[in-house]
């Protein structure tokens, strides 16, 4: 019982509980298309990958899992990305429980070293940013799938929401077999996904600075300045390196128009930030490009 009163011990317990619950749900017969349910290893691996927003898969998400199974996976990487400790903070606030310094520090560690401060304010920011970014990206993707690709509304909405939540949480899961390779020429699909990944990769401390100080660079904390500067530098280096190495590769950027080449080079400079989507065949990348990906990751 002592672990439940200690946030430092509670965090791994909650993650483990989410993984086990997710694995159990994925083993149910109606979680897979064939109606047989996933094996224990497949279910546990997929659940762990989703909660830890790793994005690694051992079966094709699009064809192996049923609508229920995909819904479970979406819920798992939303929980993982949001941070179970953040949810625990919410439950404590709803119950009227006060939070001391230890709880606030534990919450700060879980959500990318948030500044020790008012838990209510932090929680409100997390909810607001999450719902806003995921909602806006989901709407853009849904409309694009409907208007440009003639998806039925329900199908467009599903794919829009799935990719929006996956992108914001840097999960890398896709409801398409080829990730987003089928949309490598569509900036309306790729750019919102890129921006969502970048926003969440910056972290909530940076968002807090923006909320309190706007775009006043001098008023920002050193952490925010370093984070933003490093992010821009890494994106530029990745973009230039990928474009330079893959520009003439016939299996990746080679056959594309200049604008599409630049778009996909930019997309793949963002994705190593634990996002995991791909608009190009990563297996066809040149060795130097893969090395750059390793460095960026």
Model-derived regions: residue spans:
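Membrane-proximal intracellular helices of multi-pass ion channels
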Residues: 1-297
